[in-house]
Curated annotation (Swiss-Prot):
PANTHER family: GAS VESICLE PROTEIN A1 (PTHR35344:SF4), GAS VESICLE STRUCTURAL PROTEIN 2-RELATED (PTHR35344)
The organism's place on the tree of life at top rank: Bacteria
HAMAP family membership: Gas_vesicle_A
InterPro entries, alphabetized: Gas-vesicle_GvpA-like, Gas_vesicle_GvpA, GvpA, GvpA-like_CS
Pfam families tied to this protein: Gas_vesicle (PF00741)
Gene: gvpA
Listed name of the protein: Gas vesicle protein A
Family designation: Belongs to the gas vesicle GvpA family.
One GO cellular component term: vesicle membrane
An example molecular function term from Gene Ontology annotations: structural molecule activity
Source lineage: Bacteria, Bacillati, Cyanobacteriota, Cyanophyceae, Oscillatoriophycideae
UniProt-annotated location(s): Gas vesicle shell
Entry keyword set: Gas vesicle
Major localisation: other
Species, as recorded: Planktothrix agardhii (Oscillatoria agardhii)
């Protein structure tokens, strides 16, 4: 995948369109502990993409119900 370099500035609409077209995944992991005792642990995976992009890549890695059912 080649990186495109554009000299002009991008508008917000172009940036949002590109994010929805390509998709973005944010993994977050937070742990709060006091004196070695874990008080709070948060794990999150946030996916931002269009439905079409999500289904395209989710099926490839087996995250959809259709991909989870073995073919007969």
């Amino acid at each position: 995948m080649a990186v495109e370099k554009v000299n002009s500035s991008s508008s917000l609409a172009e940036v949002i369109d590109r994010i929805l077209d390509k998709g973005i995944v944010i993994d977050a992991w937070v742990r709060v502990s006091l004196v070695g005792i874990e008080l709070l642990s948060i794990e999150a995976r946030i996916v931002i993409a269009s439905v079409e992009t999500y289904l395209k890549y989710a099926e490839a890695v087996g995250l959809t119900a259709q991909a989870a059912v073995p073919s007969v």
